Amino acid sequence: MLKEKYGFKEVEDKCNILWEGSKVYRWNGEKDNTFTIDTPPPTISGKLHIGHIFSYCHTDFIARFQRMLGKDVFYPIGFDDNGLPTERLVEQTYKTRAKEVGREKLIEMCHEVIEKSKQEFKELFKSVGISYDWDLEYHTISKETVTLSQMSFIDLYNKGYAYRKMQPILWDPVDKTAIAQAEIEDKVFESSLNTIVFSTEENEQINIATTRPELLPACVAVFCHPEDARYTHLIGKTTVVPITETKVPIIADDKVKIDKGTGLVMCCTFGDELDIYWQQKHNLPMKIIIDQDGRMSLHSVHGQKEEIWIPVSGHWDDTIGATGMTGERATQMTKEGGCDQKEEWIPVSATRMTDDILNEINGLKVTAARKRIIEILTEKGLLVESTNISHSVKCAERSGAPLEILPTYQWFIKTLEQKAQILDKVKECNWHPSNMRKRMEVWIEGLNWDWCISRQRYFGVPFPAWYSKRKGEEGKIILAEIKALPIDPSKDLPKGYSKEEIIPDQDVMDTWATSSITPQLSALAVNSEFSLPNHRYDTIFPADLRSQSHEIIRTWAFYTILKAHYHANSLPWKNIMISGWCLADDKKKMSKSKGNIITPHIILETYGADVVRYWAANSRLGVDTVYSENTFKIGKRLVTKLWNASKFVSMFMEKHQVMSINSAHETMDKWILSKLYKVIERATNNLLQFEYCEALGAIEEFFWKDFCDSYLELVKKRAYGSSEATLSAKQSLAYVLNVILRLFAPFLPYITEEIYHQLYSYNSVHNQSNWPSKEELIYDKYSEEMGDNVIQILNIIRKIKADNNVSVKHLIKKLMIKADLRKDKLDQSAQNDLQAVCNAETIEWMQSELETEDEKYIVNIDLY
């Protein structure tokens, strides 16, 4: 017999020890029978909240199902512990900034913090019953991962997919690093639309509206639409930029929107992507007036003969600021090998502001400079109007800072030239749900930039590259030898070069550059050419499943598909399963920065792991779910009911008895077995399509409606006897509960394991090949229909008793049933169970012709 009450804390502790000791989740390396899961490695950026647990449970439902189905499941756990998120955690933990402690000290601090965080993550994953094979654990800053990441980079470089170039990139002035297009988010800011007076060479005043007047010193042209009749007479002329008094051309271009603002637009080189497009199309000068700290950086040409230069190719080192250098310094860099020739440095026109205004603006943060420029324009009578507006601004996803566009040296991976091929790969993959594929396609079609993979940070995978200063090969890129990996170019030297002959690459890889090869990290190989010893590439690549949430389709999913295509002309996985978000009560994504997170430890302590998993399973694939305490309460009821139903069944069976349904011959027993046949079929098909929510729904409905509410009540009296009918009931009860436990096992692993151990076997319910098969059963259509008729009559009787305010056990003197006796009369076996459950002394059948299938029976009762 089971205990009176289920104690989840005691059971969870016992099961965790059991599972760890028995290695029930271990991957055995069966090449032809492996089911490989590409697991999302959590970012080491702080504590996990209930929203994280939500999505990790979804993957575990599939892992447990596939294991029980008979597959040798490869289910690793990784920790994404390199990169900017970890640096941010260190800065928050130690109340410092990376640049204050220096590179070496920061890296040391990062290692200390991630060790503590990883232990907390491990304990949480184990406490919620995630069935990882912990022997397959990996880390994105480990020696093996760094080696594979550097192999990946070298392979892409050798194939011409990775390149280094000076070009405008998205720059985060808070974290002081380049970021990729996929790492931006749009935020709404309060701002002002400022209409400013420009003057043409004929002293005609023209008005231009802008939200960024601080960029006036960078204005290199004014644009109008070629068909805008208001301004066609100005095309080809020049205008004077306010404050700077610089003359710039007025140019026609069809990308100008006639109905936006005044119809005139100033081009400021690096204001936005359209500015860059115009600069390149019309061969305009380049002016860089914002530095990497997000401050105004202006250079006066008064009394200065030489020009300011910026490099467009070659090596960029710390002696070169974001605003360029003088021609003398450019020549010096050429001699040192920083670039191949002086023609690779482009002159930048400096501002012609008066020195007093320049000195006042120089060094200000962008927002402060904007405010002061507006004041100066007002003082000079050059501001027509300033209107308050709300508008969308591109910001860094992590820091939240508004982005600038700066030309700097970065490493890139080609994406734009391979759009069509990547779209083909996307279509080859099976998307669950299928509509999520469209998100990926829209993202790829909208790409405007190649993937910038270099970051100006410290704690990450270094690029295995140096730049030669040797005479005759100045600026040459030197890559590490594969056998020398992993390397740190700031400490190691390339073969055949001295320290004086090279400049090490100081950047680190974007953390997505490593996360995008998680299938290969698990395989210990990038492809068949680049691998570690004892790799398992041929066994587990490509993976069977990638599970992730929808907001990283544009990053993790896209980059992983891109790299697998480049490395092996392959998909990284056959299926991708997309989870929605767990939303807070305010219907916003849970986020520590928003202050709306819920700590999983509190929920686990209150309800237990199975209830938390039940809550997670009640969300449909790809659909955002609002956190609901009510779902936890329903889950708790289910766990309690499963325990109590099992207690009842245990009264009619011997411990660990042999399962058999050979004697199950009574109609209602064959009815429940036929219903069980269908639910096994339905749940299996749902889980094969990764539809865990639908699978749980089918199992739960069967358990509550068919098994508990109907079958247990119908056979209760019969199970207490000693006849053949009793044996039929006992065998059916024991068998059906056994299957129910196995069906619930992927979702409720703890309580099912405990009951299974107590009643059926010392082996784990989660063992390989323990998923129930409908082939064990025989579907009996006659018994199912007969049983459904019993349930229909029983429900009518229950309603009549309720309407008469008597208990369901109240004795019925006579039960009178009208039906079409030629086809709807119950057989004797079914009638016996009905008579017992409704407590009727006699049943009288009467012929009746009824119209609809839903109203087969008219029931009347005589009560005592």
Swiss-Prot record:
A motif ('HIGH' region) lies at residues 42-52. NCBIfam families: PRK13208.1, valS, WPE_wolbac. Its EC number is 6.1.1.9. ValRS has two distinct active sites: one for aminoacylation and one for editing. The misactivated threonine is translocated from the active site to the editing site. GO terms for biological process: valyl-tRNA aminoacylation. It catalyses: tRNA(Val) + L-valine + ATP = L-valyl-tRNA(Val) + AMP + diphosphate. Gene3D superfamilies: HUPs, Isoleucyl-tRNA Synthetase, Domain 1. The lineage of its organism: Bacteria, Pseudomonadati, Pseudomonadota, Alphaproteobacteria, Rickettsiales. It holds the Pfam family Anticodon_1. Monomer. InterPro entries: aa-tRNA-synth_I_CS, aa-tRNA-synth_Ia, Anticodon_Ia_Val, M/V/L/I-tRNA-synth_anticd-bd, Rossmann-like_a/b/a_fold, tRNAsynth_Ia_anticodon-bd, Val/Leu/Ile-tRNA-synth_edit, Valine-tRNA_ligase_type_2. Belongs to the class-I aminoacyl-tRNA synthetase family. ValS type 2 subfamily. This is Valine--tRNA ligase. One of its GO terms (molecular function) is ATP binding. A motif ('KMSKS' region) lies at residues 589-593. Catalyzes the attachment of valine to tRNA(Val). As ValRS can inadvertently accommodate and process structurally similar amino acids such as threonine, to avoid such errors, it has a 'posttransfer' editing activity that hydrolyzes mischarged Thr-tRNA(Val) in a tRNA-dependent manner. One of its GO terms (cellular component) is cytosol. It is an enzyme of class 6 (ligase). The gene is valS. Its main location: cytoplasm. It is found in: Cytoplasm. It comes from the Bacteria.
